[in-house]
Amino acid sequence: MTIIFVDNEEYNVDKSDNLLQACLSSGINIPYFCWHPVLGSIGSCRQCAVTIYKDLEDKVGQLVMSCMTSVLDGMIVSTSDKISRNFRKGIIELLMLNHPHDCPICEEGGSCHLQDMTVMAGHTVRRYRFTKRTHKNQYLGHFITHEMNRCISCYRCVRYYKDYSGGTDLGVFGISNNVYFGRYNDGCLESEFSGNLVEVCPTGVFTDKTYSKKYSRKWDMQYAPSICQHCCVGCNISVGEKYGKISRIENRYHNAINHYFLCDLGRFSYDYSNVDERLTYSIYRSQNKTKIINDVNKTIDKLAMKFKKSSKIIGIGSCRASVESNFSLQKLVGSENFYLGISQKEYDCLMLIKDILKDNQIHVPTLREIEKSDVIFLLGEDVTKTSPLIALSIRQSIKGQVKTQDVSKNIPIWHADAVKNSFRNNKNKLFITNLMNSSLDDIADESYYASTFDQVLLGAEVYKCISNNCISNVTLLKQDLLSCAKRIATALTLSKCPLIISGSHSYNLDLIKVSFNIAKSLKVIGKNVGLILLSSNVNSIGVSLLEGISIEKVINKVLLKQIDKIIVLENDLYRYLPESIVDTLFKSSSCTVVIDHLNTRTLKQADIAIPTCNSFESSGTVVNYEGRAQRFFKTYHPNSSENKKSILESWKWLHLLYCKLHKISVFWHSLDDVIEEISLKIFSFSKLKDVAPNSSFKIFGQKLARSHHRASGRTALYSNINIHEPRPPQDNDTMFSFSMEGCQNVQNYLPYVPFSWFPGWNSVQSWNTYKKINNENYGKHLFQDTTKFVLTYYKLNCKNVNKIEDLYLIVPCYFLFCNNELAQYSPVIQENVLKNAYGIINTEDAKVLLIESGSKIEFSYLNKNFSIKVQLSKEFKKGQLGLPLGMADFPFFLAEKQVKVFRKISI
């Protein structure tokens, strides 16, 4: 820390920051455009000018760009002198010459960095009266709208898209006063992180197309801090709602996880919550008759009547449901009758990952810690598709050597161009094994495309080279692969911070075991090694701690007639099991109850279908790949709009039924009560109470406001339905209020900020004005530290699938949207992405089958026909058929099954 003097005030600032960042984090307003805390400084916009003085005797000073100026001890700075004020005012006037001044029709209006900076710089009178330069806008896909006339040429978009996220299809064209930011032609942006352009751009050039369809100004929406539900990373998000519909998703800063960015899956896939087909009342089906029950008490009475004298009840949980909801189901049916709702293959992988996390011998890095790794070995996980923010962090880790070299070269880390030049010939190492090419191949030192079995063999040889301990037969490897394994092992042993990444998406236990063995052997030789094992869902780790049973084991109970009633919690069984088996399961049950917010095929087959809240309408806890428990909070109350709905959180439905069956009074009155019982009864969740403050938490005697203090029209939202002013819903589960009434001063409680705002800063750039944000410990790591280091390794089976001639082995292939259950119910994904889904087949196999790229093929398994378009790949191993398992009509049970492709379908 060092002391500087700004406008005659003394400030303690971080010496590693540039002057602009030091001032912003101290609460001093300086307008800027091209600087970004992650992208660094290039000094192109010239907007952040300030005056610095040599000493107290200096009356003239020197005009400098604060983003390009290092902080010096005792520095004297003025932001309010006449010269710098006039300079900044003149610069923003020049930037605005060709701007259309279309704020009233711009989606960024009210949340626009350009608006904030224009006001801050004092540019209030427009003097330019001549023809403005205009551009033709481009079609950039179904997520982002392009309005090039609003551009001020700050270069942030291309610096983020190309330099940071590694995109190649967006650039800058033209020269001088006529530059154009876009693609070389119209088309969908290819990057999995293109949505961040919406927040990176300080104007309205790139706007959220999904938000435009249900647009509301920022101050008229209701927000809540939440957790992205689409993968196991657990990114922090802010969810905005108006009129009972989710309007947009914004990034919520977390120092250890997502930082300033989200992936497109997390940002644009929220519309599953808004679909009209969603169930909002209970349905009872009996003897081909359907009865609607739009009352909570009547629904519980009907359930109790059905379950009254039954002892053969099973509960099937879900990895997309919260810890609290799964625990409530387990409490209702008993631990011995609780099923996790996942396949046996995934169950085995998940239990192994859980054991490794509990063992806690190898550190599990956060996303920010990934960026500090100097050698990464990625085994069998296409992380760009399964956990995209992991891939983004891997890209930054390749630049990690610069961060250790810049000190010796006297290059400040915020100096973007200097750091970029220093990095050109110095990068960290990345080694990849995968079924086929991936989006990270462009930065990989070596990529090995092979079957999962061959990837395990390569991993085993790497382990052998590191530890000189042969745990399996690897003589099947060719000489060139032995050399590859030695190169990988050498790089890992010479590294300071190696990282091994694998996971459950290949459904292969040996892949996880060999990843652990490699990491363990590196730790034995003194390396600061990290190990990341990814799972398939947002709460896979959390559910695994409840010690349930795999879904396949239900089949045995069906055969033994040990099932009378079934409760399915937020799960679609048709995604995991063959259709015939699920149908048999339902027929064997005298009553099947399904609780879900998605209109799944399982819900449609239920005898009693019960609507429940999704993550935007409920509060609860999920556990990410680190074992970090995080709380998400409801954004709005689903029963408070003009439509009468009977929707409760899943845990409330289950608890009401439990109390009714046991003839006792309700004793879980809020989420705090559920968490209290979980903490007491399950040791792994003993820290659950510490994840976030309870519902009684207040600041200055007030709950935290979900709405902006400028929110307008609250009492008139539904005046066309009812002229009487309704009371705002009361939230007994969290520390937030459903209103603008409440504490808005939450700067000291940043992990729980519903939306980003700071006086004078209405856009998401307000995050940059807070003091050093350190919410790294937000959430709670559930796994205790081990005190004894036990040297144990896993023994590999190394058994290949017994391949049958002329049959194709089905392997899971992953795509950003197609495999995700929630995304598949989002209309924008259904209309634009799912219809173009495809499988993968080897080029040589395609010649034998007489098919070409884009052809549609058909195959059969268990008397059910499947069809899909296919793309050809040279890297994909012969004899395999890659399918987007988890997508509708392609259940997970197909993994590692062998099928015969028996015909090509004409399209």
Swiss-Prot record:
Short name of one Pfam family: Fer2_4
Record has Secreted as a keyword: no
Residues that bind [4Fe-4S] cluster 2: C151, C154, C157, C201
Primary enzyme class: translocase
Entry note: cofactor: Binds 1 [2Fe-2S] cluster per subunit.
Segments forming domain 4Fe-4S His(Cys)3-ligated-type: 83-122
Alphabetical GO biological process terms: ATP synthesis coupled electron transport
Molecular functions per Gene Ontology: 2 iron, 2 sulfur cluster binding; 4 iron, 4 sulfur cluster binding; metal ion binding; NADH dehydrogenase (ubiquinone) activity; quinone binding
Binding site for [2Fe-2S] cluster: C34, C45, C48, C67
Coiled coil location: none
Catalysed reaction, written as an equation: a quinone + NADH + 5 H(+)(in) = a quinol + NAD(+) + 4 H(+)(out)
Residues reported to bind [4Fe-4S] cluster 1: H99, C103, C106, C112
Domain 2Fe-2S ferredoxin-type: 1-83
Cofactor(s) needed: [2Fe-2S] cluster; [4Fe-4S] cluster
Single GO cellular component term: membrane
Keywords annotated in UniProt: 2Fe-2S, 4Fe-4S, Iron, Iron-sulfur, Metal-binding, NAD, Quinone, Translocase
Quaternary structure annotation from Swiss-Prot or TrEMBL: Composed of 13 different subunits. Subunits NuoCD, E, F, and G constitute the peripheral sector of the complex.
Name assigned to this protein: NADH-quinone oxidoreductase subunit G
Native source organism of the sequence: Buchnera aphidicola subsp. Baizongia pistaciae (strain Bp)
